[in-house]
Amino acid sequence: MFYSKSRPQHAARTNVAQAAANEKPKVPELEEFLTKRDYLGAIALLSFRRHANRNDLKNLEWLAYCYFHYGEHDKALVIYKELLQHEDPDPMFFVYSAACLYYMGMYKEAEEQALQGPKCALQTRILFHSAQRQGNDDKLMAYHGQLTDSIEDQLTLASIHYQRSHFQEATDIYKRLLLEHRDYLRSTVVYVALCYCKLDYYDVSLEILGVYLSAFPDSAIAVNLKACNHFRMYNGKAAEAELKTLAELSGGQHLDHDLIRHNLVVFRGGENALQVLPPLSDIPPEARLNLVIHHLRHHEVGEAFGLIKDMEPSTPPEFILKAVVHAMLGQVKGDPEHLKKAQQYYQLVGASASECDTIPGRQCMASCFFLLKQFEDVLVFLSSIKTYFLNDDDFNWNLGIAKAATGKYKEAEETLLQIANDKYRNEYTYTSWLARCYIMNGKARLAWERYLQLETNDESYQLLLLIANDCYKMGAFYFACKAFDVLERLDPAPEYLEGKKGAACGAFQMIVAGKEPKDLLRDVISLLRGNNSADQCEPIVAVMRKWAKNNGVKL
């Protein structure tokens, strides 16, 4: 029997056609996008469907949901408001709108919108957060009492602890939830790492992040936190390198996120701060604080005060920054009220149970005592954290002055000389304290050389006074005589002449005792005869000349 080949050939062609049809790319379903958390893809699909059918309310709900989770809360809010305009809307849309408003930083509006919705756990959480943001502790405690042991409520409580700088309490909640729901809440590991970062345990934070990033290397939040740890431990360049890795993994899309843009400003030492930070307002909360810091670094104290004067501080960084602004304003204006407020803010942080044993807490107590001029106490706190600031010019500036103010001149000189920043080295305060240390350490010549480097102005005049009086007190009479001589030339006041005469006699006594070279006598006599007051100095000169003649000293 012979079989026809025509049917098998036709069947083969049919199978090929079907296979080709099956291989055509399918349009992904919404569920696929949501499973992958590809909210941008979901938004594209839902927007396309919306154009096809604008009356599909379920499609609109999903579009709002995806906008919200993609971080475009303003667009989600517009859709929820549209949904509320339809007949017999779901009252939960009020609660969802409140969530959008909260993330947009509109906390009062979020509270009002949430109260229009039905009583539910989500409403309570939004009201709880809004009360915290508005600083209403009575409402905060009331809503706290309504929280349950559910995962969502406990995560909310941990978040509030974090916002109130109760990082250990937040960590305890996160760890407990991780033990109970390890597979379900893996991302909570990042929150634990965030708390350790805030507690200054940067190495612990990095260790925790390492485990998470090995599974999710493109996590924007985790990579950003790793960058922050590197910034704290190393420098801005090391931090920025981590963000470049994130950019490569994400195709650069994450770099447009407000948080990343904010952190890049910080990592780059304030570069583009005035372009990036003002539009951010308080999202993230550090944006306003970093803008204040930017103004302070550029000596724009008025602008910094304008940003912070109406802010009610609630976290240690806010209290510290407010203290710094008041301290700088008090120094610029000579206003003791601002200095008093600064001292009080520093004390609030440094004496608090949560901060007293932290590095910032001890810095605050040192600053508090600095403003009170209790320098022995300043040294107690600065010495306890010295190992963390070995090459820090700001730290050495404060430590050096505190040591000098307590009479520890040798240590003060060593500390002040470690400062490399010209901003400090060119300040009169630095020059005057270093000059005093030189004199007290028997190096009056170095103090005089510092004076010779200055231009003639009020600061050089003040330094002359310091050199004249300190050298006289320490028995460095030759340089005291030189300083009083210049002072007399600038201002022929009788006290400068008397000072010069006394210093000249002291220098002569040192020469006679063999503690100064005899050749110095020629300079001393020249100083006494140099001004219009030479006649008043002639009796002293006569005694000196007689001694020189008797002792074979050529003048």
Curated annotation (Swiss-Prot):
The keyword Acetylation does not apply. Pfam families: ANAPC3. Disruption phenotype: Flagella motility defects. It is found in: Cell projection, Cilium, Flagellum. One of its GO terms (cellular component) is intraciliary transport particle B. TPR repeats lie at residues 57-90, 151-184, 393-426. It comes from the Eukaryota. Keywords: Cell projection, Cilium, Flagellum, Protein transport, Repeat, TPR repeat, Transport. InterPro entries: TPR-like_helical_dom_sf, TTC26. GO terms for biological process: intraciliary transport; protein transport. Coiled coil: none annotated. Belongs to the IFT56 family. Component of the IFT complex B. Component of the intraflagellar transport (IFT) complex B required for transport of proteins in the motile cilium. Required for transport of specific ciliary cargo proteins related to motility, while it is neither required for IFT complex B assembly or motion nor for cilium assembly. This is Intraflagellar transport protein 56. It comes from Chlamydomonas reinhardtii (Chlamydomonas smithii). The gene is DYF13.
